[in-house]
């Protein structure tokens, strides 16, 4: 069973009778002492048996979950996020425990998670790339997501756009997406614009964004995103699909080239990537790579795809990385 720092604090405030057991190694206890709660110290093989509930605490809340399962402990809770999340909650009154599986990563940590919570990502298109990208970013804790698309859900979308179901056919994509994303993360701000991106609304749409995700299948719109990205100085994360192949690159960042620099002339062979057809799994992969690169940009993780083009071959599961 799991308990969050906020829930544990409520137990304390309500005067509930329970025992907190710190099973961390001695060096962790000394370096990161628990604050704001009385506790006993034990090892994972000498946990005291009590009549009331017990709350086990390790550094990140992972070890204690395993201990409870392995020892079949009853009336025992694992503190989600462990001592790290508890001490952060005590000092900042901000419960970050729901993201404990990513804050345990040293490249993310609590500071990286705070950057995500205070960030804004603009996503152009709620199709095969936009759906998985926005789902992952909402779950990861991005504070504000701005989505734009004037399209409605069609039956042919459902195999590659996992935000939508049969009951959503005929409804505006951004309205359905907003409703479902707010259920995924109730504290995220989802701003939905029920229009296609154009030269009149573009700059206003990306205003205050840290990153722009190009999740379109339309060359003209992609060129417009590139222009807006250059004008505003906001990096553009390009994603493209062709049959079993997918592309991702971070453009217009740190003086690196943009889409129009790479493709100064319109591409031949059709205006929409969708003309070639696609299996639903591939946009899921590419859209999630776009989301991953967004997180890396916001948090400041390297290496990333700034000035690089990643080519993924889904047929052979091979990749190429080209310097731009």
Label each residue range with its predicted role.
Residues 1-4, 10-13, 17-19, 23-53, ...:
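Adenine nucleotide-associated cytosolic modules
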């Amino acid at each position: 069973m799991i308990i969050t720092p906020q829930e544990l604090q409520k137990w304390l405030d309500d005067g509930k009778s329970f025992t907190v057991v710190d099973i961390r190694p001695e060096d962790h206890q000394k370096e990161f002492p628990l604050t704001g709660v009385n506790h006993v110290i034990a090892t994972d093989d000498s946990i005291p048996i009590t009549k009331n509930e017990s709350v086990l605490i390790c550094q990140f809340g992972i070890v204690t979950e395993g201990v409870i399962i392995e020892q079949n402990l009853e009336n025992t809770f694992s503190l989600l996020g462990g001592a790290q999340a508890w001490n952060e909650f005590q000092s900042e009154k901000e419960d970050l425990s729901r993201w404990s599986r990513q804050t345990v990563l040293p490249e993310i940590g609590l500071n990286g998670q705070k950057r995500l919570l205070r960030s804004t990502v603009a996503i152009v298109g709620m199709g095969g790339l936009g759906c998985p990208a926005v789902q992952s970013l909402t779950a990861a804790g991005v504070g504000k997501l701005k989505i734009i698309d004037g399209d409605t859900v069609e039956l042919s979308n459902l195999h590659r756009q996992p935000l939508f179901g049969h009951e959503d056919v005929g409804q505006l994509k951004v309205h359905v997406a907003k409703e479902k994303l707010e259920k995924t993360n109730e504290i995220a701000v989802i701003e939905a614009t029920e229009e296609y991106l154009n030269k009149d609304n573009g700059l206003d749409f990306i205003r205050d964004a840290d990153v722009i995700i190009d999740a379109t299948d339309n060359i003209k719109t992609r060129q417009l995103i590139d222009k807006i990205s250059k004008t505003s100085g906001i990096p553009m994360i390009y994603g493209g699909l062709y049959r079993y192949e997918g592309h991702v690159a971070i453009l217009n960042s740190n003086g690196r080239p943009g889409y129009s620099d790479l493709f100064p002339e319109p591409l031949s062979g059709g205006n929409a990537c969708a003309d070639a057809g696609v299996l639903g799994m591939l946009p899921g992969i590419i859209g999630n790579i776009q989301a991953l690169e967004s997180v890396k940009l916001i948090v400041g993780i390297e290496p990333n795809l700034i000035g690089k083009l990643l080519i993924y071959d889904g047929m052979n599961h091979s990749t190429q990385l080209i310097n731009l």
